[in-house]
Amino acid sequence: MPIVNGFKVGPIGLGLMGLTWRPKQTPIKQAFELMNYALSQGSNYWNAGEFYGINPPTANLDLLADYFEKYPKNADKVFLSVKGGTDFKTLAPHGDPESVTKSVKNALTRLRGKKKLDLFQCARVDHKVPIETTMKALKAFVDSGEISCVGLSEASAESIKRALAIVPIAAVETEYSLFSRDIEKNGILDTCTQLSIPIIAYAPFCHGLLTGRVKTAEDLKDFIKAFPFLRNMDKFNPKVFEKNIPFLKAVEQLAQKFGMSMPEFALNFIIANGKGMIIPIPGSTTVQRAESNLSALKKSLSSEQLEEAKKVLDKHQIFGLRYNKQLESTLSI
C-alpha cells in the first residue's frame, strides 16, 4: 500500500470536489453512502477543498464535518487532504503568509474539530510570493500540531526542491492521465521519485474524456451540457476533440486488448507507472461510480503491457492545452 506521511492509504483515492462544487449539491444521504463505501473498500485518501462549493464556498468542508460528526469512528481511518490558499471569487492563488494563515484557520474552523487536517496544500503556487515564504507560514501550523503535514499542488520540480528545504513535503498533487503525461517529461516525476514523495494524480480520466462516454462529436455535445464548465477547456473544443479521436481510439483498443474498460486501463496505467508512488484520485458522486473505479484494482498491467501501451500512445500527438491559455500560466510553477 502507498504511504503518505506514515499513513497507509489505498492505491486509489477519492476526489470529493464533485459532491459540492456544482449548482445542485449531491444529497447528503447519497454522499455519505459513497464515502462509507469508498472507505470500506480501502479508498481512504480523501481529497477536499476549502473552496469546493458555491453557496457557501466551504460546502465541501461542511459536508466532511457533518460526515465525521455522524461517523466519528471513521475519522482516524481517513487521510484528509485539503486544498486552500485560493480567492473564493477569482480562484487566484494567494500564497502570502496572511492569506495562507487565514485559509488554514478557516479550514480548521469548518471541520469543527470532527476530523484532523492531515495535509494542507495551496491549490496553486503563487508566482508573486516566494514559495519559501508560503512554506514557512504552513510550517508554523505543522510545528503547532494543528495540521499533520504539508503538500504541494501544481508545483514545478524546482519549486518542490525549494519547498522541501523549508518543510517536509508529504505529497505533490498534479494532473496526470493518459491524456496529460507532462510530469514524465518536465522533471516532476523524476524529482518526486528521487525524493520519495508520493504523487497524487487528479483528473485521471481527463475530466471525463477517458470514461468511454465521449467517443463522438455528438457525445461531446451531450457531455458538455451535463458539465457546462468544460466549455472553457481546450480539449472539449469540438475542433480540438476531433483531432484527438485517433488517440481515444488507440486508448480504447489497448484497453480491449488488455481485457479492461477504458477507465480501468486509465487507472491501471497510472498505478503501474507509479510503482506504488502515484495515487489517482478519481471523483465520484455515487456508490456505483466508485465501485466502477475501484474495480480497476481487480486487474493490473504487467511491465511489458505498460511499455507496449507507452509505445502505442507515444505515436499519437495530443491536441489542446490541459486547461486553456489563461489558466495554463498557473500550472507547474
UniProtKB/Swiss-Prot annotation:
Indicate where this protein resides in the cell.
Cytoplasm
Q: Does the keyword Oxidoreductase apply?
A: yes
CDD domains for the chain: AKR_AKR8A1-2
EC class of this enzyme? oxidoreductase
The annotated active site, in chain numbering, is: 52
InterPro entries attached to this UniProt entry? Aldo-Keto_reductase, NADP_OxRdtase_dom, NADP_OxRdtase_dom_sf
Q: Which UniProt keywords apply?
A: Cytoplasm, NADP, Oxidoreductase
- Look up the domain of life of the source: Eukaryota
**Xref: SUPFAM superfamilies:** NAD(P)-linked oxidoreductase
Q: What is its EC number?
A: 1.1.1.65
Q: State the Gene Ontology terms under molecular function.
A: aldo-keto reductase (NADPH) activity; pyridoxine:NADP 4-dehydrogenase activity
Q: What is its main location?
A: cytoplasm
According to the UniProt entry, the coiled-coil residues are: none
Protein's job? Catalyzes the reduction of pyridoxal (PL) with NADPH and oxidation of pyridoxine (PN) with NADP(+).
- Annotated family: Belongs to the aldo/keto reductase family.
The molecule here is called Probable pyridoxal reductase 2
- Organism from which the protein derives: Schizosaccharomyces pombe (strain 972 / ATCC 24843)
